[in-house]
């Protein structure tokens, strides 16, 4: 009758592959399908009505209702009637606060709106009694035939009370598709996309954040920078370059930022492009206001040593590169065996394999400098080093002659202060050694020269007055004495007069004897005779 099975329970166990008895537990396959995909939903406004309705249905007996127009029906004792068609199988189990739906292929739910109190799977405590009745299907199935009717009855009152107590602990935030409740104050969650019950037809979504999240300053917005207090800790071994204190970086320093120094002269207040000590890229000299570069442009220079464009042989980088093995002063040390090129060759300009950066034909990333060869073509001897030093000295003389020698710039403020303190220390030590420090020889000579010059001026003042304003004829003794005085003063003249005499000697030989005779004659004559000599050529001219 039951296909080789003695009872209907054995037939159902073999049909649903359940080893345990159907009276003791729910079919495992059905339970797995129900709990595999669970969706929560709730109708808050009908929650109280469902509780009272469920209590009445729990006390009532099992009911099975089959409509003639339906194809397949499964009736649950504590729930509404569920319609199943041949193409779809749907089982709906609902709790007092939520509805659990399991979706499979060709599954549709058609629940009656009148009875919304469902039977409940109580989280692995479903039922103590399960009654199943199976009717044998007819050979020719019609739309009105019934395949299965499964009735689940919960008869224990203690389990109902336990399930009701469990449902009381369920809050609205645990369920999707619900509104914000005043009771949901015990959790910190950012609920997103919760819809209002009144705006179900609309597409508007109410976005809200819990008050506790706002108080705790928890947000999902990514900050623009790092936290301000991230590096302010005692255990951090970070030193600030702005205030020289440990525990934070310069970007998080509370003190104002220092002015950036220039990379050329290390002074603050200007940058590289406004530096007065900028150098010319062609001649490598400081670019002053009167600087005129007579060198060729860098793209017209070609080195005779490495055959690269941009410099001459005396400024080739191979000069300092050849000292890679030298550890003692003297000529560079040569390697015993020449080093071969490596097999893996990459370009620093285009990042391709097979060539070096100075051989690359692609566009340069940095156009202000020309590429140089990384290899060493020759090592210098003592003779080569001496010849290069001579050329450098000769070039330095030419620069000094043209006036293009770089002037000395002011020292930075830090070095001046250090020098000032150092001088003060020296003066203290010198005061202890000798109370009256000795002056240098140069300062002593300058002082003696100044004193002698003052004496000569005093001696010359009366002589000049007598010559300019003579007081009649004087005896020969007085004239001889006066003539001797200027001779002494001429021999003891200052250094300025000596230079002037040297300039006069460099003049033509014809002008020199006339001036000398005129000076010798004028030294012995009076002012009256001198004036007569000046008037004679005027009279002769007429």
Swiss-Prot record:
GO cellular component terms attached to this protein's record: nucleolus; TRAMP complex
UniProt-recorded name of the protein: Zinc finger CCHC domain-containing protein 7
Compartment annotation: Nucleus, Nucleolus
InterPro entries, per database record: TRAMP_AT-DNA-binding, Znf_CCHC, Znf_CCHC_sf
Residues in cross-link Glycyl lysine isopeptide (Lys-Gly) (interchain with G-Cter in SUMO2): 129, 136, 236, 251, 336, 410, 432, 474, 485, 488, 531
Biased composition (Basic and acidic residues): 412-421, 436-456, 499-510, 518-528
Predominant location category: nucleus
Record-linked SMART domains: ZnF_C2HC
MF-aspect GO terms: RNA binding; zinc ion binding
Amino acid composition bias (Basic residues), ranges on this chain: 422-435, 531-542
Gene: Zcchc7
PANTHER family associated with the record: ZINC FINGER CCHC DOMAIN-CONTAINING PROTEIN 7
Gene Ontology biological process terms in this record: nuclear mRNA surveillance of mRNA 3'-end processing; nuclear polyadenylation-dependent CUT catabolic process; nuclear polyadenylation-dependent rRNA catabolic process; nuclear polyadenylation-dependent snoRNA catabolic process; nuclear polyadenylation-dependent snRNA catabolic process; TRAMP-dependent tRNA surveillance pathway
Compositional bias of kind Low complexity: 474-489
Source taxon at top rank: Eukaryota
One Pfam family linked to the record: zf-CCHC
Subunit structure and binding partners: Component of a nucleolar TRAMP-like complex, an ATP-dependent exosome regulatory complex consisting of a helicase (MTREX), an oligadenylate polymerase (TENT4B or TENT4A), and a substrate specific RNA-binding factor (ZCCHC7 or ZCCHC8). Several TRAMP-like complexes exist with specific compositions and are associated with nuclear, or nucleolar RNA exosomes.
Region span, Disordered: 110-144, 396-542
Keywords tagged on the record: Isopeptide bond, Metal-binding, Nucleus, Phosphoprotein, Repeat, Ubl conjugation, Zinc, Zinc-finger
ZnF segments: CCHC-type: 238-255, 260-277, 301-318, 345-362
Residues with PTM Phosphoserine: 142, 478, 480
Biased composition (Polar residues): 112-126
């Amino acid at each position: 009758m039951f296909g080789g099975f003695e009872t209907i329970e054995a037939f159902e166990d073999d049909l649903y592959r359940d080893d345990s008895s159907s009276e003791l537990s729910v079919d495992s396959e059905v339970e797995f399908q129900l709990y595999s995909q669970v969706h929560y939903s709730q109708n808050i406004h009908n929650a109280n009505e469902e509780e009272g309705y469920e209590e009445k249905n729990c006390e009532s007996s099992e009911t099975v209702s089959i409509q003639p127009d339906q194809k397949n029906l499964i009736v649950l004792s504590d729930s509404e009637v569920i319609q199943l068609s041949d193409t779809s199988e749907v089982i709906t189990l609902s709790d007092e606060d939520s509805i659990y739906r399991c979706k499979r292929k060709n599954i549709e739910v058609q629940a009656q709106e009148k009875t919304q109190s469902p039977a409940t799977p109580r989280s692995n405590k479903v039922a103590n009694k399960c009654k199943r009745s199976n009717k044998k299907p007819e050979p020719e199935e019609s739309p009105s035939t019934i395949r299965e009717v499964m009735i689940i009855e919960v008869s224990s009152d203690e389990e109902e009370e336990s399930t009701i107590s469990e449902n009381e602990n369920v809050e609205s935030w645990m369920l999707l598709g619900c509104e914000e409740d005043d009771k949901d104050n015990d959790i910190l969650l950012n609920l997103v996309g919760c819809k209002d019950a009144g705006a179900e037809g609309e597409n508007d979504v109410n976005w809200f954040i819990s008050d506790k999240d706002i108080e705790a300053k928890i947000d999902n917005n990514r900050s623009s920078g790092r936290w301000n207090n991230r590096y302010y800790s005692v255990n951090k071994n970070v030193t600030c370059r702005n205030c020289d204190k440990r525990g934070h970086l310069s970007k998080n320093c509370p003190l104002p930022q220092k002015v950036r120094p220039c990379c050329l002269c290390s002074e603050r207040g200007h940058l590289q492009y406004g530096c007065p000590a900028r150098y010319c890229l062609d001649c490598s000299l400081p670019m002053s206001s009167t600087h005129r570069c007579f060198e060729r442009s860098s793209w017209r220079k070609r080195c005779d040593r490495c055959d690269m464009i941009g410099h001459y042989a005396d400024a080739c980088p191979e000069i300092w590169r050849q000292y890679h093995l030298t550890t003692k002063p003297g000529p560079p040390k040569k390697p015993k065996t020449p080093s071969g090129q490596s097999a893996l060759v990459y370009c620093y300009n285009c990042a391709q394999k097979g060539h070096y950066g100075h051989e690359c034909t692609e566009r340069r990333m940095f156009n202000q400098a020309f590429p140089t060869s990384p290899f060493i073509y020759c090592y210098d001897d003592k003779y080569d080093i001496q010849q290069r030093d001579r050329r450098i000295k000769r070039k330095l003389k030419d620069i000094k002659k043209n006036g293009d020698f770089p002037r000395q710039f002011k020292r930075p403020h830090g070095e001046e202060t250090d020098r000032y303190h150092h001088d003060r220390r020296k003066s203290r030590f010198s005061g202890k050694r000798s109370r009256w420090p000795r002056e240098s020889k140069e300062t002593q000579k300058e002082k003696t020269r100044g004193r002698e010059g003052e004496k000569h001026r005093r001696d010359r003042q009366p002589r000049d007055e007598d010559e300019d304003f003579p007081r009649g004829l004087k005896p020969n003794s007085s004239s001889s004495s006066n003539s001797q005085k200027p001779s002494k003063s001429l021999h003891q003249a200052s250094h300025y007069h000596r230079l002037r005499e040297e300039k006069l000697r460099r003049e033509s030989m014809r002008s020199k004897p006339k001036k000398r005779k005129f000076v010798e004659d004028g030294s012995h004559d009076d002012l009256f005779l001198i004036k007569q000599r000046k008037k004679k050529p005027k009279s002769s001219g007429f």
